[in-house]
Amino acid sequence: MDQLFTRVARDRLTCLMLGAAEVAAALVRKRNGGVISPADFSAAMRDLRAEVLDAADFAKPPSDDVLINASVPLLEKHSINATDAVVLLAALRLAAQLRAAGRDLVLVACDRRLLRAAQAEGLLTFDPENQTQAELDALLSP
């Protein structure tokens, strides 16, 4: 994720608080599974809090009951979990706004099912665990 944070202006980054909580949960799973050390976990959580959760310059739209309810057809259509459906719908709505202004959205995620669903819905995607800096640069170039 460091490559994304160094490449993209802060005012162009958006993350649902629900999505940020999913990142925290993934870090806990990696720590509990021995994939990352307790020290690396602490550092990653500190960075997540500073760079996203507590950062005033990082857009964090809410996921309210209206958004959650509207996301149900996406979880049925793509066989994704509820959290992913909410994230996908929020991304689709933001992408529509950006595209109307001549810009686009890149959904960044590590979950393969979410990435497949996003691609099926016409979104650009980036998987920081499996794609390269060059691939990110190609997605972000004008």
Locate each region found by the language model.
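Hydrophobic core segments within long, regular secondary-structure runs in both alpha-
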Residues: 2, 41-49, 68, 72, ...
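Helix-adjacent hinge/juxtasegments
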Residues: 29-65
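Short, well-structured N-terminal submotif of metal-dependent ribonuclease cores
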Residues: 1-19, 27-44, 129-142
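Conserved phosphoryl-transfer catalytic core
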Residues: 23
